[in-house]
A protein has these predicted regions:
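A short acidic Gly-Thr/Ser loop motif
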Residues: 145-147, 194-195
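Ferredoxin-type iron-sulfur electron-transfer modules in oxidoreductases and energy-metabolism complexes
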Residues: 117-139, 156-260
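Iron-sulfur-associated redox domains of electron-transfer enzymes in respiratory
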Residues: 1-143, 149-153, 161-162, 176-182, ...
Length: 260
């Protein structure tokens, strides 16, 4: 019977009745197991955009496995922690300096590992027309079940453009590539790499990989970090009347009416 699972010092460890067994997490992931692909690429290892970040990095010595490292990231988090201590439900103490050093080293090591996986996954997509051809081929399996859209925390449009018949023809499978282009155009700059669009895809299309690869490129271009930077991303707000006037003034019939 398995009692506990954890990742510690580069090992995936299973504790069972009478002992434990560990295997290199690198070996596991090279073989296609281990963490989800999007988690491997993630560089947000300590969620400092939250009020409190809790984990075991930095907990050492006799407290290892028995205590939690709590990093206070906001005034609200500090107040919550103080109130818990006052209520007697929590006991705190200053972190061990050695533990802080180890915590920093572990976090930096995980950043490097994330960079390694990004390089591995993104280079596998190719560039330019080769990347586009790969995405078109992979998404040709799409059955338009809408799991990628319904599960996306960023996609919250009241009226979804992928359901407009003049953009995506009803009843056609696979849907024309406009279906995918709409998703990329709406989500790519704000993708937080949660992986749900890939996790729930009935046809095993690597949607999260495609979206994350585009998000990283857009982040390099515009500097917006989704999930961290709370300012509005580029072109987040458009005044409809002014935009209509601008489009009309171009005199081009190649400009699509985005308000239709």
């Amino acid at each position: 019977t398995v009692h506990k699972e954890e990742i510690d010092k580069g090992q995936f460890i299973i504790e069972y009745e009478g002992g434990h067994k560990g295997i290199s997490i690198d070996d596991l992931e090279e073989a296609g197991y281990g963490r989800r692909p999007n988690c491997r690429r993630c560089k947000l290892k300590v969620p400092r955009q939250a009020d409190l970040a809790c984990g075991n990095w930095g907990v050492i010595g006799d407290k290892a496995g028995k205590a939690t490292f709590v990093e206070v990231c906001s005034e609200k988090g500090a107040m919550l922690l103080d109130e818990a201590v006052k209520a007697g439900v929590l006991k705190t103490e200053a972190p061990n300096p050695k533990g802080l050093e180890i915590r920093g080293k572990v976090e930096n090591a995980m950043y490097k590992l994330a960079d390694k996986w990004r390089k591995h996954d993104f280079e596998g997509l190719g560039t330019g027309r080769d990347r586009l051809a790969k995405i078109v081929k992979e998404t040709s399996r799409c059955i338009k079940c809408y799991q990628c859209i319904d599960s996306c925390p960023i996609c919250y449009c009241v009226e979804c453009s992928t359901k407009k018949p003049y953009l995506v023809k009803p009843g056609e499978l696979p849907p024309n590539f406009m279906f995918q282009l709409i998703r990329f155009a709406h989500i790519a700059d704000s993708c937080i790499n949660c992986g749900q669009c890939q996790e729930l895809c009935a046809m095993d299309i690597p949607n999260a990989l495609f979206m994350h690869a585009q998000q990283v490129e857009l982040e390099k271009m515009f500097g917006h970090v989704p999930g961290i930077d709370m300012s509005l991303p580029l072109l987040a707000l458009v005044e409809e009347r002014e935009e209509r006037d601008r489009l009309a003034a171009t005199g081009s019939d190649q400009i699509f009416d985005i308000f239709k």
